[in-house]
């Protein structure tokens, strides 16, 4: 038996594994993730490594392969647990071991650790005075200045000595050589939690919140670690339930991870958690520097922090004794990784909790179909919060039929009802949020004469017009100058559907010139603290209206917001995705939940071309059960998740002919070698966007009730495809229930 071993956790070594022979006496006990002692290098010095692979085949001549010395006793480290998790990811999500390890293990990369260096006087005052007299006689002004300062203050930071006293590094080195001082270094861990102030507020839980907390804590204390679906209407106080459960877990000496769906939620969430748990809280997000991210992993390993808040990557924080994982807004699509391995944070969290003996809380006002289906079938436990916390009431909702408005001659983006309510709220000095699921000024540019749509020459998508007139492809970044004449027929009737966030901002300023307006989308939030700055401005009352895309409707709590306008509710209904109705319902329900969250009553206006659609009606009524019953019937009829499991096999290649042949081979392989009762293989078909950056893509779908059947198919395909010359220029990815 042979073991693949990595010797260090950094990017450089993750690409390099070393093969060792496993002694006979260890073959029955060695496992993935174990820490082992190995001879390394020409001198065979003994070091430790991590087992990342086991097999019977030697990759090198047998006589050159060294033997593992032994298994390191008592070394079930956080890293070794992460490696076992990587092996689980590899099996469940179709990736290589190295891809899985790079996902879960806290990698160092080439981050230079920040240090605080201090200069310490190590001689007594009498000796120091003798040296001082000598320096005065020799007119050694710099040395005199440094020693005089150290006599008054025996420990001074090196950077202060250099900047304030104007002392060079050479003089400090001379003092070290003379035995006068000692320079000491201390690692400085960057703390990404900034600008958090205020005191902890005591919030009295209502009866439903108390019951939820009591249930979770009681089960936990009895060693009954469960997964809970906390289904609470918007504003029902789910976060307070999280905080109480976390406080209990921390009191037992364990740690907690809180996942948020995207960086836009961090600002307010961190404030609430930091006020409760202080410096034991840290955050992780994609906009932090590599150094900041690495520091948080080190702080977690050292036990300096107990609560990590962040998006799905925070799930891999190397805590030694994890007791609770919270996934807020668990329905969010951001919890599904778009890169290999294409894991879902919810599934991984449940696996981590099962291994660690921990609880999981999935919180949402609009649970994913997967989670609610699991609760309805007894796989997880459902806890409901039916009413808003405090005195908040659910808002009044108006559905506006855009077709009728158009017949009445209203072609503006603000229909009559919305315009009336906006005027009313501005007069009352209350705040307004306007939600649009778009980016840019225009969705697409087309010729009104011949119908030609301006498309990217490299991708099968339309170009988007921005405020400066440029046309841009948001897939590959291609840009083109403003078009005034149709390149196909020469007509000058070329324009776009002006309903992007920038266009809405312009219309608001034109219609309500006195209003103070903020826009929050991908373009205005670039940079490290872009989200925080805009949210702080709005929270502090420095703007009357906040316009934005999806990021403004998710999880924010602004007490003075009493009107939410949804400008184009049904745009997401037309996506080529079986989850389109679910995502539309979730977005609209979340948007409606932003209004009237405190003492003031709220209004929501939903503008739509399909007011009768069940997802829109259910969202307006905040009726999750009505939506679920209709949607699950559709999923059962079509055999879609969560009823059945669905694997998407995506093949991509710059060679269109090769891609067609490869996709046909995969389809035939599944049909001829993997068929079991109830299996369905569909395709191949062109991907929704067939060409991106001159690379073509096709998709094959495989359905079955048993997920393991799909995993077996992936593994069989992988064995035949990896290393095959026929697939050398074809990239194959597998996504299960994506």
What does each model-found stretch correspond to?
Residues 200-206, 210, 214, 223-660, ...:
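Inter-lobe coupling/hinge segments of SF2-like helicase ATPases
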Residues 1-364, 376-392, 673-676, 701, ...:
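Accessory, non-ATPase domains that flank or precede helicase/AAA+ motor cores in DNA-metabolism machines
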Residues 87-90, 419, 423, 505, ...:
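Generic solvent-exposed, charged/amphipathic alpha-helical segments
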Residues 2, 15, 44, 429, ...:
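A general secondary-structure signal for short beta-strands and their flanking turns/coil
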Residues 87-90, 147, 151, 176, ...:
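Short, amphipathic alpha-helical segments that act as regulatory/interfacial helices
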Residues 53-55, 105, 185-187, 436-438, ...:
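A general secondary-structure junction signal
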